[in-house]
Amino acid sequence: MGAMIVREVFEIAEKIKNMEIRGAGEIARAVAEALKIQAEKSKAKTSHELWKELKEASKILYNTRPTAVSLPNALRYVMYRGKIAYTSNADLESLRYTIINAAKEFIYNSEKAIERIGEIGAKRIEDGDVIMTHCHSKAAISVMKTAFDQGKDIKVIVTETRPRWQGKITAKELASYGIPVIYIVDGAARHYMKMTDKVVMGADSITANGAVINQIGTALIALTAKEHRVWVMIAAETYKFHPETMLGQLVEIEMRDPTEVVPKEELETWPKNIEVLNPAFDVTPPEYIDVIITEKGVIPPYAAIDILKEEFGWAFKYREPWED
């Protein structure tokens, strides 16, 4: 008999897949929550059955979005703690408690991290700064909002972020805090870089050499900023750092549906020899980045490897906890 997976796990997996739940932090908290619900609602009679269900649930969640490293890192955080309990012969209720607790702890820490990044990053923002941002990053917004709440006079240039327009979400959110916003098309980033003092963006993943994987368009903005000698700050929680890259694995860049770029009805009328490509992310090399702001402090990109060793060093002694 197969493992009994609760409905909520499938619902959360589906929402991550179709981007109803989006943004690395939101995705990470959602998968931790899914494991918590699986543990709470499980009808398992033994710790062996519950562990089997948790592994199955983890696999379902793991396969939803290939690039967002926050997703496997959240699963690792919860499941490694579960694995230690399970392999030390924990009984059913102890294992359940371990998983629920680890999930709550992960969610709490990840919310606190955003606040802390705001406090640390705001120190780098000066009164009168014009800041450019791209896509929608809770960590980047936290830096700008904290600086504004400290009474610094800032203005933010927001790129629309095609094809899914995450810039609209960012622009409205910043404006709701009272921050003056300029909203521009992605192609205008270089034109407005001359009036920009700092670039503050988030990250989906950060590799061992300090390269940043983020929403498509991030690398172009960072390149333009470097050309104009404008400071580039990446705001990211430590669970965005990608442990597998220490072992030389390359990050897979997710390709999304062409109909996000050209509506289906229109695409069907196009000549067949036009191929529409829609990569979700690009890679910004570390030399285009001045600092990475984490909840543990400000680091230069080349120190990413130190964060990885500190946070995930243990991960290399084992296989993934949901693998057999």
UniProtKB/Swiss-Prot annotation:
Protein family according to the UniProt entry: Belongs to the eIF-2B alpha/beta/delta subunits family. R15P isomerase subfamily.
Which reactions are catalysed by this chain?
Answer: alpha-D-ribose 1,5-bisphosphate = D-ribulose 1,5-bisphosphate
Q: Name one Pfam family in it.
A: IF-2B
Q: Which InterPro entries match?
A: IF-2B-related, IF_2B-like_C, Initiation_fac_2B_a/b/d, M1Pi_N, NagB/RpiA_transferase-like, R15Pi
Superkingdom classification of source? Archaea
Q: What else is known?
A: Reaction proceeds via a cis-phosphoenolate intermediate.
Q: Which GO terms describe its biological process?
A: L-methionine salvage from methylthioadenosine; pentose catabolic process
Give the keywords, sorted.
Carbohydrate metabolism, Isomerase
Report disulfide bridges, numbered on this chain.
Answer: none
Query: What is this protein identified as?
Result: Ribose 1,5-bisphosphate isomerase
